[in-house]
Amino acid sequence: MSLLRNRLQALPALCLCVLVLACIGACQPEAQEGTLSPPPKLKMSRWSLVRGRMKELLETVVNRTRDGWQWFWSPSTFRGFMQTYYDDHLRDLGPLTKAWFLESKDSLLKKTHSLCPRLVCGDKDQG
């Protein structure tokens, strides 16, 4: 059970890492053609063909992903997302926390007073 709990705790960190990697990939300039060419001897080997094909497929996926997420990384869209998140989740956090704290304090004082012996705390009616 603890293994499952650890996996669930690691999920937000993993999502953050993927988001950072996507941002880095989107911000990097396009690679110039012909910068990394294999030596002539390795050009026709099977592994170089597999590596070349995988590179083509991955570049296609990365470029499509970058193009698809480009709208999100524009300043106005990201600012709008953060403003909406703040409005939905964080705006009322201060007053809600203060109200919860005061309510919890009052409840705790009532419970403590009800458990307190009359000789130590005195009678409620005398107060």
UniProtKB/Swiss-Prot annotation:
Glycans are attached at N63. GO terms for cellular component: extracellular region; high-density lipoprotein particle; very-low-density lipoprotein particle. Keywords: Glycoprotein, Lipid transport, Secreted, Signal, Transport. One of its GO terms (molecular function) is lipid transporter activity. It is found in: Secreted. Expressed by the liver and secreted in plasma. GO terms for biological process: lipid metabolic process; lipid storage; positive regulation of triglyceride storage; triglyceride homeostasis. Residues 1-27 form the signal peptide. Its main location: secreted. Belongs to the apolipoprotein C4 family. May participate in lipoprotein metabolism. This is Apolipoprotein C-IV. It comes from Homo sapiens (Human).
